C-alpha cells in the first residue's frame, strides 16, 4: 500500500480515504436492525474510537492534501457518505482501490463504485481477508465482475510512472 500511496502522491494523483466508522458507546442504541458484520465488529471492538483498533498505522495516515470522506458504517465507502460527491467535484472517473477487508469493505466499495459508473482498478496485494478462501472469493470470483482490472502494487506503480513520464 505504501508504494502505491507514494507513487500516486508523487504523480500528483489525488488520494482519497474512505474509512470505517470508529465506534463509540451508544452508537447502536436506537437502531432496530444491526447487520451481523456490524455486530461482530462492535463486539470485537474492531474499530473502537480512541483504541488501537480504531487507528491507522502511521505510514497510512492521511497527509495534507489527501481527502477524507465521511466514515462508512457497514461495508461500502460510498454508502451514506460523501465519497461520490467528493470524487465528482474533482472530476474523477477512474479509481484505484486498496485496503481492508477484501471480501467485505473493499468488495462492497468496488461494487458500489461500478454501480456509480467509475472505472475501478483493485490492487491485489494491498488488501487482506481473514482466510485464503475469503481472499479467493473476493479477488477471483466477486470483484472481477465489477473491477476493470486487478493488478499488483508493482504493476500500478509502473503504470503511474509511465503515465506521468
Task: Describe the residue ranges of each PLM region.
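Catalytic-core segment of enzymes that process non-peptidic bonds
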Residues: 17-27, 32-33
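Active-site-adjacent betaalpha module
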Residues: 6-11, 28-29, 33-165
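RNA substrate-binding interface of SAM-dependent RNA methyltransferases
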Residues: 12-16
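Short catalytic helix/loop segments, enriched in acidic residues and glycine
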Residues: 1-2
Amino acid at each position: 500500500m505504501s508504494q502505491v500511496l507514494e507513487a500516486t502522491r508523487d504523480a500528483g494523483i489525488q488520494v482519497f480515504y474512505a474509512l470505517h466508522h470508529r465506534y463509540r458507546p451508544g452508537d447502536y442504541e436506537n437502531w432496530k436492525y444491526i447487520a451481523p458484520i456490524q455486530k461482530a465488529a462492535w463486539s470485537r471492538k474492531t474499530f473502537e474510537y480512541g483504541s488501537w483498533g480504531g487507528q491507522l498505522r502511521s505510514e497510512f495516515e492521511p497527509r495534507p492534501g489527501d481527502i477524507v470522506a465521511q466514515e462508512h458504517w457497514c461495508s461500502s465507502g460510498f454508502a451514506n457518505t460523501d465519497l461520490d460527491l467528493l470524487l465528482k467535484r474533482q472530476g474523477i472517473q477512474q479509481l484505484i482501490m486498496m485496503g481492508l477487508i477484501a471480501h467485505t469493505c473493499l468488495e462492497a466499495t468496488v461494487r458500489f463504485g461500478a454501480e456509480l459508473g467509475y472505472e475501478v482498478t483493485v490492487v491485489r496485494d494491498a488488501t487482506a481477508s481473514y482466510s485464503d478462501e475469503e481472499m479467493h472469493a473476493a479477488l477471483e470470483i466477486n470483484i472481477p465482475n465489477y473491477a476493470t482490472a486487478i493488478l499488483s502494487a508493482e504493476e500500478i506503480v509502473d503504470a503511474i510512472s509511465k503515465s506521468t513520464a
